[in-house]
Curated annotation (Swiss-Prot):
Name of the protein this chain belongs to: Peroxisomal membrane protein PEX14
Segments for region (Disordered): 276-341
Compartments reported by the entry: Peroxisome membrane
Source organism of the structure: Saccharomyces cerevisiae (strain ATCC 204508 / S288c)
InterPro entries hit by this protein: PEX14, Pex14_N, WH-like_DNA-bd_sf
Biased composition (Polar residues): 308-341
PANTHER family linked to this entry: PEROXISOMAL MEMBRANE PROTEIN PEX14
Membrane topology: Peripheral membrane protein
Molecular-function annotations in GO: protein transmembrane transporter activity; protein-macromolecule adaptor activity; signaling receptor binding
Length: 341
């Protein structure tokens, strides 16, 4: 045993033997004991010798040797197991190797990049030309960024200006619209007021016209009567002026009992009898005042008055009297001639 175990490992070996001889771990699984001894740094050969020390019989030694061989081959089984064996390790295929290779490559690439970027520049500084080139490239990038930012700022300023102009135009339009609505409302109210005033004036004018027409119906009839009387009087005056004294005497002594022309009353007498003399005088005064201002009389009224004047009717009995010669008997003519000196 002294040949197998060296002097520097003698203490470790003796502790392993004393561990195996302990009664508290006597019933422990053999594999657990072997794993524990391996964890302490003993070799397989030293473990085998240590296992033989507590038990000098050959059965235990053969059993220990078999267990050690099963650990190396990972295929043999223990003949004296006190509990179930742990499951065997799964068999590795190409996927496991691929994953391991990928992970290894990633780690190696990461280490390479770290070394290239940080370790090597600190150990071996780069040349000034390369540093200047990198600096220039960085400056170019910053210049591009500044240009883009300036363009964006200009676009934003123009957009804000357009928006402000649009808002101003919209505000002006709204103000104009409000003013137009106010003016429209005022105009509508003014038109409504004027319409009411015109309506009232039209109603008043209509009432005035109706009243005037109703008042002038009797006046028109009176004017017609007055004109007929004036025409009768003028005709009689004409007859009287054109006749001679002989005719006047003949008419006055007519044996037929027909009254003479002198017995016919004048228009003033007739009106006095009818109680209308004052009204006729007023109408004459009104007619004289109207003649002073002919321009104030409408054309239709002038035409109507002319028609009435031109068509002044003369009674038929007057026309017949004027047209027919008054027949005087011969004996009356003789008497008249004898009476004339």
């Amino acid at each position: 045993m002294s040949d197998v175990v060296s002097k520097d490992r003698k203490a470790l070996f003796d502790s392993a033997v004393s561990f195996l001889k302990d009664e508290s771990i006597k019933d422990a699984p053999l594999l657990k004991k072997i794993e524990f001894l391996k964890s302490k740094g003993l070799t397989e050969k030293e473990i085998e010798i240590a296992m033989k020390e507590p038990k000098k019989d050959g059965i235990v030694g053969d059993e220990v040797s078999k267990k050690i061989g099963s650990t190396e081959n990972r295929a043999s089984q223990d003949m004296y197991l006190y509990e179930a064996m742990p499951p065997t390790l799964p068999h590795r295929d190409w996927k496991d190797y691929f994953v391991m290779a990928t992970a290894t490559a990633g780690l190696l690439y990461g280490a390479y990049e770290v070394t290239r970027r940080y370790v090597i520049p600190n150990i071996l500084p780069e040349a000034k030309s390369k540093l200047e080139g990198d600096k220039k490239e960085i400056d170019d990038q910053f210049s591009k960024i500044d240009t883009v930012l300036n363009a964006i700022e200009a676009e934003q300023a123009e957009f804000r200006k357009k928006e402000s102009e649009t808002l101003k135009e919209l505000s002006d339009t709204i103000a104009e619209l409000k003013q137009a609505l106010v003016q429209t409302t005022r105009s509508r109210e003014k038109i409504e007021d004027e319409f009411r005033i015109v309506k009232l004036e039209v109603v008043n004018m209509q009432n005035t016209i109706d009243k005037f027409v109703s008042d002038n119906d009797g006046m028109q009839e009176l004017n017609n009567i007055q004109k007929e009387m004036e025409s009768l009087k003028s005709l009689m005056n004409n007859r009287m002026e054109s006749g001679n004294a002989q005719d006047n005497r003949l008419f006055s002594i007519s044996p037929n009992g027909i009254p003479g022309i002198d017995t016919i009353p004048s228009a003033s007498e007739i009106l006095a009898k009818m109680g209308m003399q004052e009204e006729s005088d007023k109408e004459k005064e009104n007619g004289s005042d109207a003649n002073k201002d002919d321009n104030a009389v409408p054309a239709w009224k002038k035409a109507r008055e002319q028609t009435i004047d031109s068509n002044a009717s003369i009674p038929e009995w007057q026309k017949n009297t004027a047209a027919n010669e008054i027949s005087v008997p011969d004996w009356q003519n003789g008497q008249v001639e004898d009476s004339i000196p």
